[in-house]
């Protein structure tokens, strides 16, 4: 006698749909963070301090929001912010751009 096909668990299907939506949302947030970080570094290399610092602050804000919403772990967020600020500061110093008042003073 042929066996009946087992029914699918509805809650598992729903959780899967939710995870796919969450994955897309998290991917978009991480992509935006990477894009802004790269843009801030590029502007710092060009010596455009004001614009680089403005973009860096936006990236910092997105990183904090991602950590708040569990897209990024809080320690990973802190590490990314630290590395971004250090890189932007080094590039601006190398370009001879002023840093005081930009949130990167020593």
Swiss-Prot record:
Q: Which GO terms describe its cellular component?
A: small ribosomal subunit
Covalent S-S links between cysteines: none
Q: What is this protein called?
A: Small ribosomal subunit protein bS20
- Family affiliation: Belongs to the bacterial ribosomal protein bS20 family.
Please give a single GO biological process term from the UniProt record: translation
Where are the annotated segments for Disordered?
A: 1-32
InterPro entries the record matches? Ribosomal_bS20, Ribosomal_bS20_sf
Q: Which GO terms describe its molecular function?
A: small ribosomal subunit rRNA binding; structural constituent of ribosome
Q: Which Pfam families match?
A: Ribosomal_S20p
Q: Which UniProt keywords apply?
A: Ribonucleoprotein, Ribosomal protein, RNA-binding, rRNA-binding
Q: What function is annotated for this protein?
A: One of the primary rRNA binding proteins, it binds directly to 16S rRNA where it nucleates assembly of the bottom of the body of the 30S subunit, by binding to several RNA helices of the 16S rRNA.
Q: How does it assemble?
A: Part of the 30S ribosomal subunit.
């Amino acid at each position: 006698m042929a066996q009946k096909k087992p029914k699918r668990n509805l809650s598992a299907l729903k959780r899967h749909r939710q995870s796919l939506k969450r994955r897309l949302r998290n991917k978009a947030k991480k992509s935006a963070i990477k894009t802004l970080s790269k843009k801030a570094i590029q502007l710092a290399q060009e010596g455009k301090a004001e614009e680089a610092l403005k973009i860096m602050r936006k990236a910092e804000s997105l990183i904090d929001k991602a950590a708040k919403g569990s897209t990024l772990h809080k320690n990973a967020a802190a590490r990314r912010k630290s590395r971004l600020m250090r890189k932007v500061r080094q590039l601006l110093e190398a370009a001879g751009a002023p840093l005081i008042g930009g949130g990167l003073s020593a």
